[in-house]
Amino acid sequence: MELSHITYLNIIKNIDLTPPESVTIPPQIKPELVTLASRHATLPFLLPYINDPQYLPLLKQQAKRMLLNYCQIEQFTRRIVSIFEKEQIPYFLLKGISLCDCYPTPEYRKLGDVDLYINDPPALEKAKKLLKQNGFVLQDELSDHHLTYSYTFPAIGRTCLLELHFRITGLYQYAPANAVVDEVFSANILKHTCQTVNGISYYVLPPTEYTFYMLHHMLKHYLYSGFGIRLLCDFTFYLKRHAREIDFQRIHDWCTRSRIFHFYEIILQSCRLYLGLPDTIDPEIQYKETDCEQFILKILSDNDMGTVTGNTLVGSGSYRRITPLTYFKEGHLQMHVRFPRIGKCPLLWPALWGITFFYFVRNTYKLRRTTLRDTLHAFHKSNENSQLIRIFDNSDS
């Protein structure tokens, strides 16, 4: 591991250490360190260590922008939940300011859109109507687990996005994993808990379910395009705060049944080795340090939310080998995403497969602006990356 990587990880680890450990930054690695922190949206964390006139204005500017963005996203979140709570619509706030609150300096965690989960179908339909009545605009986006709404604040002209989840995460090819996720986060079983952020109470997932959700959120990003250090920081800080409230045996059971236990192991051990997660949290879980180093290097080589290229093809699982049947399975899943209702009728599948393939080819050349060959090659490469985490035991089931 390069010196810049080691130094960067020590700085991240220091965020929540009291007292912080001494970190020495050799002058020759400062440019690379600033570039790395910029890619991972963590520039403000360098402020205690770098005061060079060459870099300090950039660090301060980024810190101010993140502070402003935090305030705006917090107001956006308050607006949405006030609309729902006024009409007694049950919801779960995912990530966002809920996770920021676990950081020593909440404003230094990058925020994007707002994610809310509604697992009750009648409540979801009511929420959609309310959003439309309150100036939210539904975006034309194909997703198997959420709807995207935009809202523009008249006073400042800023447009913010809301992802309204009707499933907690996207579908996998591996059906048992989908079944476990649906069971854990179903309306009949899942109970909300309250979290107070800056004096305002929000409904959030209970700690055990929140931990399981974060694992699946990271897994989906990893299978798609990878992810940056922020998601590992989220996981680390959340577990540090809520470890006593988390039922780790249930986490083990859910991960085992959905066959993502190896992913949980490498995440937990990597957070211990590189981000300061205490060894006392779920101590029975261990993983090979060499694999963890390879994993963290993959994380550091990506951007904040992964490396999205124009020829990315989203994979819903990990395969021992890529065959024509693999592409057919992925295409079949995309058919269900594109046609969630009529896709339930097997008699229509042949026609829907053809339509799905037509849109895939069209999007490859017109939207992704690449070739079919390059897209499939990138899919091969993405599958190679997923072998490290042994997801679904790399099953072709």
Regions found by a protein language model. Give the residues of each.
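Conserved NTP-donor binding/palm subdomain of two-metal-ion nucleotidyltransferases/polymerases, i.e.
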Residues: M1-G112, I118-S397
